[in-house]
Amino acid sequence: MTQTRGDRNIAWIETHARIPEGKFVGQPVRLSLFQKKVIRGIYDSPTRRAIISFGRKNAKTTLAAFLLLLHLCGPEARPNSQLFSAGQSREQASILFSLAAKVVRMSPDLNAYVTVRDTAKQLHCGELGTLYRALSAEASTAYGLSPVFTV
């Protein structure tokens, strides 16, 4: 049986990512059935845009960090692509960056390929030339950007 794009991405997350915070910090990720359904809904459909909305304290930002890493250095990565997250303030913009950076640092697999640039709020995969940046509305204009993934 052929593995779907969604199932491939679920397997990649569960193989390479680690839980960044909380009681099980550092342990391999085991996505919930709901998270798997969200991932399949995004990647097993022809859509290019997905809006994820669910209640507070349901790991939305953590799931977004996993999706970001899929596009930075995982099976969804395209060479020399740009990825962004945006927030109203610098602090808000850095939340996703901080979680994704923790996942990278805790995973020997990801840490070998991804460089974390804390002061610039960037993740860079040198092998693929992919770059993620956290942007805020406080920053100057974002003209000239052509992202393949945006949160």
Regions found by a protein language model. Name each.
Residues 1-151:
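Phosphate/NTP-binding elements of NTP-utilizing enzymes
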